[in-house]
Regions:
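Enzymes that bind and transform nitrogen-containing heteroaromatic metabolites
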Residues: 1-181
Length: 181
């Protein structure tokens, strides 16, 4: 029994993934939803950093499948939150793991099957990548350069990637699926 960790991010062409409200002007191609459904389809757990949890909880907890086809996944799936502090937002099926601990995440992977899905959570994702815990990185690259903001890749760290798949959508977004070499 070993789970895989799949990270999904919306990023700009220059690597910014902070506060992705800038994605709204491009719309959401229905084929992007199909890709996300494929990524989350085998996920039994959502792993989030505390700040991302605090952004996602109020955005998702009251949504229904009629509002967004992704709502049942986000609301019904077990959520584990990594952070030194208790999340300020309540959300069903959420458990706090405590501060980041690579060994605890390794045990989590060994104890589970399927996919552990991660979105946003920059500090957490950088730690997971640095500690060799990420199996897949799904980047939805938007055709815009923002020039400033929190970047996905940690400054000064090199990561070799292996392209697994790619998709191009009518709104100009490109999905790049990578494994870490």
């Amino acid at each position: 029994m070993t789970a895989t960790i799949a990270v999904h991010e919306f990023i700009s062409a220059d690597g910014v993934f902070e506060s992705p409200s800038w994605t709204f002007e491009f719309g959401f191609d229905p084929k992007m939803g199909e890709t996300l459904a494929a990524i989350t389809g085998n996920a039994s757990t959502i792993l989030l950093g505390r700040r991302t949890h605090e952004m996602f909880a109020p955005a998702w907890r009251d949504r229904t499948a009629e509002d967004d086809p992704g709502a049942p996944f986000f609301n019904e799936t077990e959520k584990l939150v990594v952070g030194a502090n208790e999340p300020a937002e309540e959300w069903a099926n959420t458990t706090r793991l405590g501060a980041y601990d690579a060994d605890a995440i390794r045990r989590l992977k060994q104890e589970r099957d399927g996919v552990i899905y991660v979105s946003g959570s920059g500090q957490l994702v950088r730690g997971l990548i640095r500690d060799g815990l990420v199996d897949e990185v799904h980047l939805f690259v938007y055709p815009i350069s923002l020039g400033e903001g929190d970047r996905f890749w940690a400054e000064g760290e090199q990561n070799k990637l292996v392209l697994q798949a790619h998709d191009v959508y009518d709104n100009g977004v490109v999905h790049l699926s990578y494994g870490l070499a």
